[in-house]
Amino acid sequence: MIFEIIKIGSQPINFAYPIPLLSLLAFMLSGSGYNELIISYIFAFSFFTAANLWNHLNDAEDDLNAGRNYARFLIEHRKIVTEFVVAFYFVSFLLIFFISKSKEIALLLTGLSVVLTWLYSDKIFIGKIIRRFKEDYKTEVFTYILCSFSFPLSFWTIFSEISQVGVVFTLATGFTYLSGFFLKDLKDISADIKSGYRTLAVVLSPSTLLIISVMLFIASTFVVIFSSLLDVTPTSSLLVLTVYPPILFAIYKFHKEKWKITKNIISSLKIYTYSYLGFLIAFAIGCKL
């Protein structure tokens, strides 16, 4: 049972968990030890397992109707899974409380992330009183903007006190995560309409979502480029420029199709998506050259 719970909690994949890129980037940028590297990944594992499990649990009925087999497991073990969610969130708090090098602000930011991700998904408890945040684009965007920056900043405090370098880390990874959020909404359009949600995927056109995603991703690269030119991060972090050829190629293909989501840009979307990983890897390697 525990293995199944952890497996479900690892979806969807992101660059903090189960992919350990956020930990590796912070490790290389901060120059901290391996203890911080390991603890940061445990923190990411705890937080994202809780947030993902809670989201899947609240969507279990809809997911079961959509043919997702894991949903039946969640429905049958709703109480136990809820207890695991609370436990994993609690572990996140404990790690920050004992390990963070800027404890007060990190606890505040972690608490903010926990509350927002809970309200984002919840329709079992508080969601019976107020509309859960994921069902309306205003609260959806509010949640993602705050969590995209509050989580990496609290994450950074495992490695070091808040500093200019920590702010660069937060902005670069935050804009990247936000970019992926707008891209993710593209695949949720039909499901959100069917469920009666007013999410970004419903109120904005697919073309607009794609354009915003690209702009945010470019913003994340600019953060690293300017921080390098201003000597906040190593000059070698300009290695992130190597991701521009695939990004520009993808943008060219998107523009050629007038930013419409067609089968002609599927391969370009894959290239664009892999550029996220390329950017973070290049940033991490550049910090050590």
Curated annotation (Swiss-Prot):
- Compartment(s) of residence: Cell membrane
- Recorded superkingdom: Archaea
A Pfam family (short name) is UbiA
Membrane keyword on record: yes
Q: Which residue spans traverse the membrane?
A: 13-32, 37-59, 80-99, 104-121, 141-160, 165-183, 203-225, 235-252, 265-287
One GO MF term attached to the UniProt entry: transferase activity, transferring alkyl or aryl (other than methyl) groups
Q: Which UniProt keywords apply?
A: Cell membrane, Membrane, Transmembrane, Transmembrane helix
Identify the GO cellular component terms for this protein. Answer: plasma membrane
Membrane topology reported for the UniProt record: Multi-pass membrane protein
| Entry protein name | Uncharacterized protein AF_0771
- Organism of this sequence: Archaeoglobus fulgidus (strain ATCC 49558 / DSM 4304 / JCM 9628 / NBRC 100126 / VC-16)
Q: What is the lineage of its organism?
A: Archaea, Methanobacteriati, Methanobacteriota, Archaeoglobi, Archaeoglobales
